[in-house]
Amino acid sequence: MAKGGFPGGFNINNMIKQAQQMQEEIKKMQEELMQKTVEGTSGGGMVKAVANGRKELVSININPEVVDKDDVETLEDLVLAAVNQALRNAEEMIASEMAKITGGFNIPGLF
């Protein structure tokens, strides 16, 4: 039996090596995701929220035409909708990038 090997050809050393390689790829991906952004919009583009690949909001843009001091609730709803969409889009981007590394396996706790 080879060093680190088990019956049936299972080799713990190869498994550890693959896990370390995956960790390096994930770290690189996390750094790249910091530079990528996605956006969410509402009100036909009147409100736009931008999030990065770490699910952090980086900007919110509000068209002045949608600002009405007598109807703050509508503006709040538009901002909330845009932010939620941006965060969902960030989640999808992260999942897509992770699938490239993990081969589609869902590994709990990575993100």
Swiss-Prot record:
- One Pfam family assigned to this protein is YbaB_DNA_bd
Matching entries from Gene3D superfamilies are given as: Nucleoid-associated protein YbaB-like domain
Q: Which GO terms describe its molecular function?
A: DNA binding
Key word Cytoplasm present: yes
Tell me which UniProt keywords the record has, alphabetically. Answer: Cytoplasm, DNA-binding
Main localization of the protein? cytoplasm
Question: A cellular component term (GO) from this record?
Answer: bacterial nucleoid
Task: State the family named in the UniProt similarity comment for this chain.
Answer: Belongs to the YbaB/EbfC family.
Q: How does it assemble?
A: Homodimer.
Q: What is this protein called?
A: Nucleoid-associated protein TTE0040
Q: Please report the organism this UniProt entry assigns to the protein.
A: Caldanaerobacter subterraneus subsp. tengcongensis (strain DSM 15242 / JCM 11007 / NBRC 100824 / MB4) (Thermoanaerobacter tengcongensis)
